[in-house]
Each structure stands twice: as C-alpha cells, then as structure tokens.
Design a protein with these regions (language model features):
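Acidic, glycine-rich active-site loops and adjacent beta-strand->loop/helix elements
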Residues: 39-43, 205-206, 235, 308
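C-terminal accessory/binding modules appended to enzymatic or scaffolding proteins
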Residues: 368-425
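Short amphipathic alpha-helical segments and their helix-coil junctions
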Residues: 1-5, 251, 285-293, 326-330, ...
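Active-site cores that bind ATP or allylic diphosphates and position pyrophosphate for catalysis
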Residues: 94, 102-230, 235-242, 250, ...
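Secondary-structure capping and boundary motifs in well-ordered enzyme cores
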Residues: 47, 84-87, 256, 300, ...
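Catalytic adenosine-cofactor/nucleotide-binding cores of aminoacyl-tRNA synthetases and other
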Residues: 221-227, 231-366, 420-457
Length: 457
C-alpha cells in the first residue's frame, strides 16, 4: 500500500489538509505501507519554499512523519512538481503519439467568445473541437488538450462514497499542458501518482469533480487506476465551510493557542472517522490498529472547538507536571512552575491558560474581608505556622473555627479572599503550601502571612 499527501504550499497547513494527511498516515501505518509527501507547487504566484517548510513543520508537529518526501528523498524523487516538468512533457509527447491529445492554438479571447456563445445558446461551455479537426504544428504558442472520446460513462467505486458515475458528454476536451508549458493539475497528478506507484488516493471531497478527467488519462496511458477515497468537507458550527470567521483554521494557530499535538491528532482523526469500540480518547497506536476507510463517514464533519478544548484538557490532565513543564514554559515560566502546574492543571484546557490560572501566585490585591477575621488569621499563621501539607492545613482550619466561631462557607470564603484576593480558584489545601514555597524562591511572591499582614495596615 502506497499513499500520498500532496499539499499546495501557500501557507500554514489547514486543519482540513491536516486531517487528510492523518488519514493517509493512519492508512499507511495500519497496512504497513508507505506514506509519501509530495509538494504540488506549480502555482508560481503563491507557492514558496518558505510555505513548504511551514507545511512540513506542521506535519512534524502532528508527528505524522513520512517515508518519502522533498526533504528526505526516496526512490521516486523529485517530490516537488516544479522539479518534474520534463517528466510531464515526456508523457504529454507519449499521449500525442497515441493521438489522444492535440495542440490547441486558440487564444484566451477566442475561448472566452466561445464560452459566451455557448451560454447564450444554452449549451454547455465545452470546447468546440476547432483544433481537433484542424491539426497543425507551426511552432506558434499552444496548449495541449485531451480529447474525450465518444459517449458513455466514467465510473469509479469510491471507498468512502460508493459508486460515482459521470457522463462523458458532460466533460468536453480539457487542457493538460498550458501554453506556458506548465501541466495542469489533472495531468500532473495522474503522472505523479502513477510514477510513484500510489495504490490509494485519499484526498478531500473537493477533488471528486476532477476524478473523471484523471481516470480518462489513466485509461489513455493504459495504466491501472488507483483506488479513490474522497474525504468529506469540514464545516463550521453554522454548517458552512470552515473558514477564518469560525476561528483558527491552521494547525500552527492551534499550536500557538496551547493545544497539544496528540490531542489535535486525536480530534482530527475523529472528524469523520469513528473507532469500532466507540472510544473518543485513544493513543496513536490504538488509532493505527483500528483505522479503516470503511468507518470514514461520507457526511460532512462539524468542527467543534469546545470538544477539541475538552479533549486537549484530558491530555493535559493525564500528564505529569514534569512532562508539562517544558511545554508550559513556552508561554509562562517561574522557579515554582512545576508545583504550580500540579495545583491548577485540572482546571486548564490549553497550555496558554496556565499563565492566567497561576496569576494569583505573583499578583495579589487586598479583597474586602472583615478586619477581625484577618487579624485572627494573622495570629494563627504566626503561631501555628503556614501549612505545608494536608494535615497541617486541616489543623489550621480547626483552630480557625475555634477562634472565629465560623464554619463552612462563612469560614472558607473570607479565608480564600484573605489569602488569594479572589473568591474562586484551586483548593486552598494546595494553594497555601504553594504560596509558602514559591515565596521562598521567588521574590515576586508574597507568602500567605505577608498577604494577610499587608492588608491589615
């Protein structure tokens, strides 16, 4: 089994492209096959080597590493379409010998007039075959057109959508090499997939409308047609095509917003595919073992940012503070960060949220608390000491109950306000020891006692 992911490098990797790459990667790994990255960079105005690097970096971040590609080479190099022009010309010449393509000398102005005339007459805007019937080879600038033979149907058995059929009469002769010498997408993709021995073409639904033309080229060359699987669109919450107005759409944006690659991989795998055991949280190895195109849904998938955030939180909560520290340090760091992570991680769903969740450690503002309560708390912390664990915390609480005559919320709310300056946050049994230890190694942190004393003055 040989599959490929063929991005056009015009910017960072879109989540739709990322999902297609993941499905190809999973299919290859499940079948112990080969996953290839091929760069379709023939759009000279938009494709850049910098954009290619961005796409490859995004794939590396997702850890969907490839076996052959533009950076590592392989037996079917080169893996950039811009470096394969001679190959395309060779096969165009072969098709010319077989009399299935022909030179088209019509200018853009002529073609536009033909289109308008066809539309005015209520006919499909197909090419009128002028250059098919009037062959010449005088060296003038020309495109190369594929001649669609006769009537009949073109049918494929799509592995996701089932049988799909097109009428040949709906096609019209189409260009395979432009007048500037560059191949069209439909021509180059067939040549590349054949030359690279691609067995399964797993790609976005938007390419389905190109498939009948590609099948005709395969047949004209006498080549075996690969299996096709067209993956559905990804929609926004309003069920329109996912776009920037719905929020982040590129993999790199989610990385910058504090999402983990494993969570992103897990979530994108679920967009259109379901595990046979119904699980939504799984390892990469689990997904490889269970992945099958038969379980990919043909219906569009809706991108749910809240579900992605929940899933990301599950991965964060399962990690140790030591594992999270280097990841969190990209966004926020402190000498006490590891202990801080442990205190707040169950309330966090993105790495970027740790900074806000731990802001109370370095930032403190006196909240409105009864002076008598604050003085009793100060005395308790001076004489009983600042709690360092659950046992000493519980002992402090019991003594405060006796000293103040308060219990329940009437005790814990002013205690929280006096220590943190906020009416919500992590459990005090963990916050107070954290503040004590952080104040001993970070001059920007006030200890619990210093906070209470500061607000009595």
């Amino acid at each position: 089994m040989r599959v490929r992911f063929a991005p056009s490098p015009t910017g960072h990797l879109h989540v739709g492209g990322a999902r297609t790459a993941i499905f190809n990667w999973l299919f290859a790994r499940h079948h112990k096959g080969t996953f290839i990255v091929r760069v379709e960079d023939t759009d000279q105005a938009r494709s850049t080597r910098q954009s290619e690097d961005m796409v490859l970096d995004d794939l590396r971040w997702l850890r969907t590493l490839w076996d052959e590609g533009p950076d590592i080479g392989g037996p079917h190099a080169p893996y950039r379409q811009s470096e394969r022009t001679e190959i395309y010309h060779r096969f165009a010449a072969e098709l010319m010998k077989r009399d299935v393509v022909y030179r088209c000398y019509c200018t853009e102005e002529e073609l536009e007039q033909k289109r308008k005339a066809a539309e005015a007459a209520g006919r499909p805007p197909h090419y009128d075959l002028k250059c098919w019937y009037n062959r010449r080879n005088d060296g003038a600038p020309h495109a190369v057109r594929f001649h669609v033979p006769g009537d009949g149907d073109v049918t494929i058995n799509d592995l996701i959508r089932g049988q799909v059929t097109w009428k040949k009469e709906s096609l019209g002769d189409f260009i395979v090499v432009r007048s500037d010498g560059l191949p069209t997408y439909n021509f180059s993709v067939v040549i590349d997939d054949h030359e690279m021995e691609i067995s399964h073409v797993i790609r976005a639904e938007e390419h389905l409308t190109n498939t009948h033309r590609q099948v005709l080229i395969y047949r004209a060359m006498g080549w075996q047609v690969p299996e096709f699987a067209h993956v559905s669109l990804i929609l926004g919450p309003d069920r329109s095509k996912l776009s920037k107005r719905h929020g982040a759409t590129s993999v790199s944006q989610y990385a910058e917003e504090g999402f983990l690659p494993e969570a992103m991989f897990n979530y994108l795998t679920l967009l259109g595919w379901s595990s046979p055991d119904g699980k939504e949280l799984f390892t990469r190895e689990d997904a490889v073992g269970k992945f099958a195109l038969e379980r990919v849904n043909a219906a569009p998938a809706v991108f749910d940012h809240q579900k992605l955030a929940w899933l990301n939180g599950q991965y964060i909560h399962a990690m140790s503070a030591a594992e999270l520290r280097p990841l969190v340090a990209r966004f926020f760091d402190a000498p006490w960060i590891e202990e801080g992570i442990d205190v707040v991680k169950t309330s966090v769903h993105r790495l970027t949220q740790f900074a806000d969740a731990l802001r109370f450690v370095r930032e403190f503002t006196c909240a409105e608390v009864d002076r008598d309560f604050r003085e009793k708390l100060r005395d308790e912390l001076r004489t009983g000491g600042i709690p360092t664990d659950e046992a000493s915390y519980k002992a402090m609480v019991e003594r405060l109950k006796t000293a103040t005559g308060l219990k329940g919320k009437a005790l814990f709310m002013p205690l929280r306000l006096a220590i943190t300056g906020s009416d919500h946050g992590p459990e005090l049994v963990r916050v107070i020891p954290l503040l004590k230890r952080a104040s001993e190694i970070d001059p920007a942190v006030l200890s619990p006692l210093q906070r209470v004393e500061q607000c009595i003055r």
